[in-house]
């Protein structure tokens, strides 16, 4: 993530599937993005406005996903989402990716965080295991049965 341009990424996949159009490839690539209901944005806004926690986004993503999200959500909604976070870390911009430990160390060190006082939510076991080994508290959320808005009612986190 972030080590090649978006066009190089698309061309690499197209070399394996030459019959697929670039548009069809991009649509297929973006189809993996999950729905983001507005009540989650409300939750994030209230969490950010409480000023009780420092909130960061750390995402393995590329420009195709971000461009699609911005286009689909619209600039206003995307801006509202992004403004909930103190810092917005995207793998394609920082040239690091989960689950490599250097991405977690980068965020911890760049923001002078204490791992034991840091809470990381992710839906991928690999990512939470590595973060936990660094002393970070984790919640491997199951997107099929759990919702981040239930963070305070379901987890010992206050």
Stretches found by the model and what they are:
Residues 11, 45, 105:
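Active-site phosphate/pyrophosphate- and oxyanion-stabilizing loops and adjacent acidic/basic residues
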Residues 1-26:
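A metal-dependent, Asp-based hydrolase signature
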Residues 15, 23-59, 101, 145:
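Short, acidic loop-to-helix structural element flanking the phosphoryl-transfer center
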Residues 62, 70-158:
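Asp-based, Mg2+/Mn2+-dependent phosphohydrolase catalytic module
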Residues 1-5, 66-72:
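A short secondary-structure junction motif
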Residues 9-13, 29, 62-69:
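Hydrophobic alpha-helical core bundles mediating ligand binding, dimerization, or RNAP-core interactions
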Residues 39, 65, 127:
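Short phosphate-engaging motifs
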